């Protein structure tokens, strides 16, 4: 089953170097931490937000660049055992778009149902 969600906002916490993509009106159920990438899950078992800790190091960008995100997308593949997250992001750096990617893999420790989900944000 494939589900698409459109996140409507992002916040970058410069001091703590974390990005939070959100915007869903779903009710929160729980979170799962994929080694510093936190997925918030709604009552419908769909991903409703993503927080990326230590973001500048993970994306190999200056912290200032993370204030200029122009596009973000994430694909979340849930199996019985694992959750695989693939992210792509474009930032405006010196009037030029720079594309970055990041992958994460973790255990499906909260028994989410098997699914493929997508999240997208255009700024």
Swiss-Prot record:
This is Putative hypoxanthine phosphoribosyltransferase. It comes from Methanosarcina mazei (strain ATCC BAA-159 / DSM 3647 / Goe1 / Go1 / JCM 11833 / OCM 88) (Methanosarcina frisia). GO terms for molecular function: transferase activity. May play a role in purine salvage. Pfam families: DUF2283 (PF10049). GO terms for biological process: purine ribonucleoside salvage. Its EC number is 2.-.-.-. Keywords: Purine salvage, Transferase. Disruption phenotype: Cells have increased resistance to the purine analog 8-aza-2,6-diaminopurine (8-ADP).
